[in-house]
Amino acid sequence: MSTDKTYCGFIAIVGRPNVGKSTLLNKLLGQKISITSRKAQTTRHRIVGIHTEGPYQAIYVDTPGLHMEEKRAINRLMNKAASSSIGDVELVIFVVEGTRWTPDDEMVLNKLRDGKAPVILAVNKVDNVQEKADLLPHLQFLASQMNFLDIVPISAETGMNVDTIASIVRKHLPEAIHHFPEDYITDRSQRFMASEIIREKLMRFLGAELPYSVTVEIERFVTNERGGYDINGLILVEREGQKKMVIGNKGAKIKTIGIEARKDMQEMFEAPVHLELWVKVKSGWADDERALRSLGYVDDL
């Protein structure tokens, strides 16, 4: 019997919306798991990303951005998901953006001060800071806010110093058996990942009109005789005008979304994919907690 020690633990990636948490997770894993977009609030579920390297297994929880605005049911549930992720982990990576500091950052920090887990502060997008002279005083200001385990300036986009974060994570994993086989990179189903890929393309190809008012339901996900997958995706929007926007002129927009989503699915599933998309108006879904539960928004709380 092998007596080699193994190390395993859960790490929450937290921060206000749009600071680069999902990009950081994807870089730490070496491939795309969490959806990234320039819009705030693109991550709606806690995605578990798993990175195994030799005896070390880091299980990353990618939270929705914690934010102060809680009026809509979907926002309340997203904040609940983010807060519950902080409570049950060995380590927290708190992501902030360059030299910006907002009331939302302050709110996340206050939640972390109440927690027991040590916190790494990842100062992201430092390569985008115009006035480099402002960076050091800002890092000193951040250091005075809390007793951080470490403060690491990074660029999740380029990968700068992401290996430093990974190294700190490894050092703080407790001795434990691995929770997942070493080839696992997420505990989410292929059906769930298909819906996330479609949603990312919607975010990417549509204007700022649709930050929350769109979601994706996978109605059919089956293997076919060609060794690939037949996938039917239903895109839910809140208003008729949004439906027209998703479809585009003579169906051009939804065609582009479908083509790009299919490419990503084929790469992720390593098999041919036949994808069909429909758009349906379901008014008020983002305000209706029952509808959100039926769409799986609270399946992991």
From Swiss-Prot:
Era-type G domain residues: 7-175
Alphabetical list of CDD domains matching this protein: Era, KH-II_Era
Coiled-coil annotated residue ranges, if any: none
InterPro entries: G_ERA_dom, GTP-bd, GTPase_Era-like, KH_dom-like_a/b, KH_dom_type_2, KH_sf_prok-type, P-loop_NTPase, Small_GTP-bd
Disulfide bridge partners, by residue number: none
Any one GO biological process: ribosomal small subunit assembly
Region entry G2, spans: 41-45
Recorded superkingdom: Bacteria
PANTHER family: GTPASE ERA, GTPASE ERA, MITOCHONDRIAL
GO MF annotation list: GTP binding; GTPase activity; ribosomal small subunit binding; small ribosomal subunit rRNA binding
Subunit structure: Monomer.
Region spans: G4: 124-127
Source species taxonomy: Bacteria, Pseudomonadati, Pseudomonadota, Gammaproteobacteria, Enterobacterales
Residues that, per the record, bind GTP: 15-22, 62-66, 124-127
Entry function: An essential GTPase that binds both GDP and GTP, with rapid nucleotide exchange. Plays a role in 16S rRNA processing and 30S ribosomal subunit biogenesis and possibly also in cell cycle regulation and energy metabolism.
Location of region: G3: 62-65
Residue span, KH type-2 domain: 206-283
Name of the protein in its database record: GTPase Era
Subcellular compartments: Cytoplasm; Cell inner membrane
Keywords: Cell inner membrane, Cell membrane, Cytoplasm, GTP-binding, Membrane, Nucleotide-binding, Ribosome biogenesis, RNA-binding, rRNA-binding
Membrane topology: Peripheral membrane protein
